[in-house]
Amino acid sequence: MTSVRRIVGCLVWAGTFALAGTASGALDRSQVRIRDPFVLPDPATQTYYIYGTTTAGIFDGDVERKAVVVFKTKDLDHWEEPVSVWDVPADHWGRETVWAPEVHAYRGRYYLFVTLTAKATLPTPPDRPQNVKRGTEILVAESPLGPFRPLGHGAQTPADWMALDGSFWVEDGVPWLVFCHEWAQITDGSFDAVPLSEDLSHAVGEPRLLFHASEAPWVRCRGDIGELYQGKRYHAYVSDGNWLHRTKDGTLLMLWSSYGPSKYAVGVARSKSGRLAGPWEQDPEPLWSDDGGHPMLFRTFDDRLVMAIHQPNRRVERARFFELDEVGSTLRIRGEFGGAKR
């Protein structure tokens, strides 16, 4: 594991973190810029592992360093300095961007799901930004601290798709990769799922469409609300940051992100069958609408259900935690969790 303390003050962007240190080396959550935060509780050590990525502005000699990193914390507010759990090799297929890491414990090992982007381009539909090779790759380690190693030789999402934000779900003993198909390729971004081999090394079937972003009444076209991409306005509906959750009454929910009437938001979909295949129906209003997103849920060591998001959605992102109540098949935000409140 390699300390990345020397990134203090660097300029970073989507899918990344930055920090300002203290003399003791301890970090207050409010100091750490992090996008797409992922929390893995470890009951054995009463430690929370919080994963992020660094993408720009860090060099080892002439080689720009890109890595997945982890912070350790006992209380979710005071974080230890980050260490690298996977440095993306210089010759790796996906070194352009490193986004949205998730780490899942499964059958005695730890699996890292991370979204990577290549320089390689894909055929681009009319009136779309240049399409590039992007997908979620799965890596494995014996410890939540890594080091992680790739399971295969590329992404487990379809090779010709712009896919991102891969997450993990197991249904009837079958592991699934659940991910987003990006608006830049298909206009109306979608959520899809593909079954994985027992060792998670490769897909064993064709991807299955779950739903499109535009199906939610609260979602707005990014172009209509003035949300530009690379300086241009596109007619498109964004699908981001999916997370599956089974409520105590057995309802299967998906939390996910897109743009609402004016800001980035978190919505909730529910499976009418209680299974991954759906059909899925959308809550009419978002769960969270104040310019934050990419949700994931975890339970604290005293069994409180907490949602992690980044907020705001650009440039000064911070991890925010909200305690949730399950009310039948519905989630409600009780209030912000922890001391590092906005």
Predicted regions located by residue number:
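Bacterial N-terminal signal peptides
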Residues: 9-20
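Carbohydrate-active catalytic/glycan-binding domains of CAZyme proteins
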Residues: 22-342
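Bacterial N-terminal signal peptides that target proteins for export
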Residues: 1-11
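Intrinsic low-complexity, intrinsically disordered segments enriched in polar/basic residues
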Residues: 4, 18-23
